[in-house]
Design a protein with these regions (language model features):
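N-terminal secretory signal peptides
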Residues: 1-34
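Short, well-ordered, aromatic-rich surface patches in folded extracellular/luminal domains
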Residues: 1-8, 57-140
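Residue-level detector of beta-strand structural context in well-folded domains
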Residues: 14-16, 38, 83
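A short, structured loop/turn motif at beta-sheet edges
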Residues: 18-21, 41-49, 86-94
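A mature extracytoplasmic/lumenal domain signature
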Residues: 20-22, 30, 54, 89-91, ...
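A short-motif feature that recognizes glycine-rich, charge-decorated loops
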Residues: 25-64
Length: 140
């Protein structure tokens, strides 16, 4: 599952779910668009491939809340969205809350672990084709 929260701006807010049968569920959480749900399917092999990719990027080794880790979130900017990724694997379930305002430096550089996590978040969106349904939120 992947969930993106609102930010101060037009960041789209939604939740994506993928079943082991390849069933996708997209739920909009944008203000004014709440409750819009879309379903579709992808190949059943998509979920095992994403779980394998999660292992490769070190997802299961990350803390459950990036913002609470002073090494991974040394500098914090305001008004960014949060992305919550939950992976239900056979042996374990892991949930990571990634506040996108977390940086290593004031120049907005991130540590490699965060760079890999955020690339994985984009991979999940891409594998499930969420761009078909995502609408920018109304400016807050």
């Amino acid at each position: 599952m992947l969930e993106r929260t609102v930010c101060y701006g037009t960041c789209p807010a939604y939740r994506l779910r993928l079943s082991n049968r390849g069933e996708i569920r997209f739920d909009s959480h944008n203000p004014g668009d709440e409750g819009r749900r879309v379903t579709d399917t992808v190949a059943a092999a998509t979920l095992p491939a994403l779980i394998s990719r999660a292992k490769t990027v070190g997802f299961f080794d990350l803390p459950s809340e990036i913002a609470a880790d002073s090494v991974l979130c040394h500098n914090r900017a305001t008004d960014h969205p949060t992305v919550i990724v939950t992976v239900f694997a056979r042996a374990q379930t892991k949930r990571v809350e990634d506040y996108h305002g977390c940086f290593e430096t004031v120049e907005h550089e991130t540590l490699p672990a965060i760079t890999r996590l955020r690339a994985f978040e984009v991979e999940v969106d891409s594998a499930l084709g969420s761009s078909r349904w995502v609408r920018p939120a109304n400016r807050r």
